[in-house]
Amino acid sequence: MATTSDLRTNMIIRYNGQLHRVVEFYHHAPGNWRAMVIMKLKNLETGKTIEERVRAGSEIEIVRVEKRPMQFLYRDGDVYHFMDTETFEQIEVPEEMIGEPAKFLKENEMADILFYDDNKILGVEPPLFVTLQVTEASVAVRGDTATNVNKQVTLETGAVISVPAFVNQGDYVRVDTRTGEYIERIK
């Protein structure tokens, strides 16, 4: 058994008999009390996020998860279709299982699918950064450059993000899929 000192963000653990993803955690030692670890956990079955306090050094059960790289094929409503490039096996993943990064998935891009017990899908980990084309962008008004001016643009996947005023329609931008933030313009 592992202890709370082995915790890492995005780790899958079994807590109270159910599978949870560690969203965040931190060690807290209040004055003359015993140290504790405060964990924010996302239940993989219900999707609910809870905050739990456990004594530092408590035993936790880390679940072994298999990551398989798969190619994103297409989206059909709220269902995303992925294919294993070695076996050509196709799977369907509901949008709520992917979460916020779903809006940055581009067709034919690779993503890691997390499996438990060989066939149960736990989630999808898209690449940390993706390069997408800007399909719609408002024109920056001359004279609005006294401060850092951001504008909203629509990307080829339909996602809307905030970018600096110099980004125009047709430009390629790099986006962080974890936060949805603009990183840089690609030339």
Curated annotation (Swiss-Prot):
GO cellular component terms listed in the entry, alphabetical order: cytoplasm
Gene3D superfamilies on file: 2.30.30.30, Nucleic acid-binding proteins
Pfam families per the UniProt record, alphabetical: EFP, EFP_N, Elong-fact-P_C
GO terms for MF: translation elongation factor activity
Pathway given in the UniProt record: Protein biosynthesis; polypeptide chain elongation
One Gene Ontology biological process: peptide biosynthetic process
Keywords of the record: Cytoplasm, Elongation factor, Protein biosynthesis
Keyword Glycosyltransferase: no
Record's subcellular location: Cytoplasm
SUPFAM superfamilies: Nucleic acid-binding proteins (SSF50249), Translation proteins SH3-like domain (SSF50104)
NCBIfam families hit by this protein: efp, PRK00529.1
Family of the protein in this entry: Belongs to the elongation factor P family.
Purpose: Involved in peptide bond synthesis. Stimulates efficient translation and peptide-bond synthesis on native or reconstituted 70S ribosomes in vitro. Probably functions indirectly by altering the affinity of the ribosome for aminoacyl-tRNA, thus increasing their reactivity as acceptors for peptidyl transferase.
UniProt name for this protein: Elongation factor P
